[in-house]
Amino acid sequence: MLLPRRCPRGDSSAMCVLAFAWQAHPRWPLVVAGNRDELHDRPTAPLARWEEADHLIAGRDLQSGGTWLGVSERGRFAVVTNLRGFGAPEPQRVSRGALVTTLLADEQPLAAIDESEFGRFNPFNLIVADREAAWFLSNGSGPV
């Protein structure tokens, strides 16, 4: 699956892209490739185990404290992409990076995700997967 998204600066030559293969090969249950081509001047930390949440391995958005992509020790993977075209982002909303950190810390089954909370975030696409299931979630409207 490939999820291209225009970056906020409106440059059509730059896209945020994610490609992943889930349960496509017995040796590698999940393969992920992507780029975070959102705001090059936004401070980030590279992929690492988080000290305060040592079950989490992810990059870190140093501005909001969340992450755009990560994996937990239990094998849960999550990635969020911004969804553009619904007006300017509202800065008072909860950071979309909190979705990923919350879902990676959660031990409930993926089927129990509470989508009623999604309205607190600016528009997003979210992919969450573990060994048993993979989910695509979004709070945007229209085709993906």
Regions found by a protein language model. Give the residues of each.
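N-terminal nucleophile
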Residues: 2-3, 10-144
